[in-house]
Structure formats: C-alpha cells, structure tokens
Regions:
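A general "terminal functional-core" signal
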Residues: 1-180
Length: 180
C-alpha cells in the first residue's frame, strides 16, 4: 500500500489519514540515513500533503507529475510540479516524464527516491483523467526505475492511487511496478 500523499501535518485529507511518504523522508533525514531525498509522485493527483509537510526540509525534494484539472483543485507549489492536461495519453505523458527526469538529473543527485507509482493515471480509472494505457504505465515504471538505476540511486516504491470496482483488475495494475 502506501502513497497517502494528501494527508497534511495537522489533518487527514483526500482518503489519507497520515502521510507515509513525508514521514519516511523526514525520518530518513532526521536519523541521518540520507542527506537528500526525492519524493517522485506520479499519482494522477498532486501530493499536496507531502508538499505541505516537507516544505520546511530543504533536503527533501518533491516532484509531482499530475493532472492539472483533478483533485486537489488548489495545487501547492512543490520543488518541481508538472501539470498535465486531461486526456493527454501515453505519448505526451511519457515525454513529460522523460523531460522531468532529465531536469531532475541536472539539478540533484538524491541518496534515495521515494516513488509513488499511482495507477490512477489509467484510462479506465474511476478518479483519473489522463488516459494513460496499461502499456503506458508499464513503460512509465520502466523509465523511472531504469533512470535511477543507471544513476545508482535506490528507489523505494509505494503503489499509490488507483480506483476501480473490479478489484482483480486494480490489483493487476498495482502489481505492474513489481513486475518491471
């Protein structure tokens, strides 16, 4: 599970009670396990709570690629935010991911990446609107893991958002990250 990125410091929000990504990042910094951390959030929704909680930690970098027209409707300003138009599909989404990863590469070299591999970007997801196919999600996860692997930067993953009444299909989408 995990990826409860809407929970703020003082309150839960958007189906999230506490923010596991922010808590993990802060704990790693405060316990001196890492000097710099990237939280890469590819859920369809911006991780507003993560941004809010981590904003006072200059060595925690938040990067969110999300729908520009989906919850939360008032976006926070994180370290790097990429708002994608609804209905963008695989090609545009993956090109924005590639550009963002290159931008990150030229700006920071974190000790670890905490990756929210949300599958609510999927074209048939009940709460998403980016129209990314299953093949697009597979390619996305391959791109992310390869990018950081070639830089010798470890990646810890949470499955993030994904919504469907078909639980087998949803579980299959969430399993993608573990099969690439």
């Amino acid at each position: 599970g995990g990826g409860t990125h809407h929970a703020h410091y003082s309150h839960g929000y958007g189906f999230c009670v506490f923010n596991d990504l922010a808590y993990t990042a802060i704990n790693l910094i405060e316990e001196n396990y890492a000097k710099s951390i990237l939280i890469l959030d590819l859920d369809v929704h911006q991780g507003d709570g993560t941004i809010d909680i981590c904003q006072n930690y200059p060595s925690i970098y938040t990067c969110s690629i999300h729908s520009e027209s989906n919850f939360p409707f008032e976006k926070k300003q994180g370290w790097m935010d990429v708002a994608i138009p609804a209905g963008s599909g695989d090609d545009f989404y993956l090109s924005q991911l590639q550009k963002t990863l290159e931008n990150i590469k030229h700006r920071i070299s974190p000790d670890i990446v905490l990756y929210d591999a949300g599958v609510d970007v999927f074209s048939e997801d009940g709460l998403g609107n980016l129209e990314v196919t299953r093949e697009g999600i597979i390619k996305r996860d391959e791109i992310v893991l390869k990018h950081f692997n070639t830089r010798n930067i470890p990646v810890a993953t949470v499955i993030g958002g994904g919504y469907s009444s078909d639980t087998e299909e949803l579980a299959s989408r969430h399993a993608i990250i573990f099969n690439v």
